[in-house]
Amino acid sequence: MLRKPIVLAVAVTTALSLLTGCSGGDENADGKKTLKIAAFEGGYGRDMYVQVVDAYKAKHPDVDVQLQLSKTLEDEISPNMKAGKFPDVVVLPQGRKAALAETLVKDKALENLTDVLDMTVPGEQTTVRAKLADGIVGNLSTNPYNDDKTYLMPMYYAPTGLVYNKGLFAQKGWQVPATWDDMFKLGDTAKAEGIALFTYPTAGYLDSFFFALLADVGGDQFYKDVMTYSDGVWKTPQARQVLDITTKLLSYAAKTTVGYANEQDFTKNQQSLLDNKTLFMPNGTWVVGEMKDAPRASGFEWAMAPLPAVSAGGKRYLTTIVESAWVPSGAQNKDAAKDFVAYLYSDEATGIFAKSNAIQPVKGIAKTLPAEIAPFYQLYEDPTVTALVGGFASTAPVEGVNIKGTLFDTANSIISGDKTVDQWQTALNDASEKLRQAGK
């Protein structure tokens, strides 16, 4: 799934926070309440949303559910939102280039959904909170203001790590590296056989890589300091070590990486893994479905590993991507929107989503996972692996500052030689400091 397409960022101004609506809602001529759902059509496909909406409509004949699906959702809904025409529910990953969810968070233009957690799931006897896996709410991904209020409901969760071909490793007799020293030794071995150590679909996919590496190098507190723009955090030895490890890894990247790291060609970087031209790439469970029809080397078998540890026996982190559902403050049917969001956690809805490998963070779902992706989720059972959920804290908007872009996208310039690691570190420190000041 192209979570980070290279598209022009949509300028969503602070005026959005002023375009608030009432929960009375729109009604059709026949008296039906209109509920507008906008969902991003990513690697999981579109059919699951159509099926879930149809199932909801069957139980709510008094609601006219209008579903909008798009691979460029921000481009389509943002102009209407700036004109005061809001969808009632949006299902859209955070961390995308257009940064729509993040902009609305900064502008305080999202509806508080804390009460949804205590709603009874439509058609069932239990609450949403009781169905959700422990720890999946209450982090910066769901509670962006670092308080007890939830604004973004966790929709799908997926482990992300270094995806590789288990069959190739078995064929070559290679071991998955446990430390970075082992990783670079393997890189030299693979290079001698004409195989690159590393690639990425687009630079945006390095989010899961960096978050895990930051925690690995500096520990939980250092990771939190980076995410909350602690004073001088990018000047620390730990920060420099993160950038040095990354720069060395990028020196082993496939030569085609940067050229294909865009919205049109990103699957070609993914294909290099299936063709045994590259060993590792950062990705998530959705890649299995996204590349299901792609040709592959004989004996290919999907597998995932956490990042290598800095030292032998060190803790290893698995960045967990949580995609979100949210309600704009300007939505016209907030009550109906919250009911629909609660329905998304029903056994009926979760079953439909799971068939497309869109796994929701509800208790007991691991037992129902398709065999092809079950090993990815089994990584959570490894006692040496820690799940990492969250991301950069929200602040007031700062013109010209995009710390995710500075951290992730600069990888392209490191590979091409257009920037140095010193320039990278300086730019990150400058961006972090500006966001620290904005967060005061």
Kindly give the residue locations of the regions a language model identified.
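Short, solvent-exposed loop/beta-turn-alpha elements that line the ligand-binding surface or hinge
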Residues: 112-132, 218-241, 293-296, 309-316, ...
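C-terminal capping/gating helix-and-loop segments adjacent to ligand/active sites or protein-protein/ligand interfaces
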Residues: 359-364, 377-436
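Conserved N-terminal structural module of periplasmic/extracytoplasmic solute-binding proteins
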Residues: 4-107, 124-126, 176, 296, ...
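Extracytoplasmic/periplasmic substrate-recognition and gating elements
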Residues: 58, 83, 252-254, 293-359
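Extracytoplasmic/periplasmic solute-binding protein
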Residues: 141-155, 160, 184-232, 269, ...
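Short helix-initiation/N-cap motifs at beta->coil->alpha
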Residues: 69-76, 180-185, 259-274
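Hinge/lid segment of periplasmic solute-binding proteins
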Residues: 97-159
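Glycine-centered hinge/linker elements that transmit conformational signals in sensory
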Residues: 190, 228-261
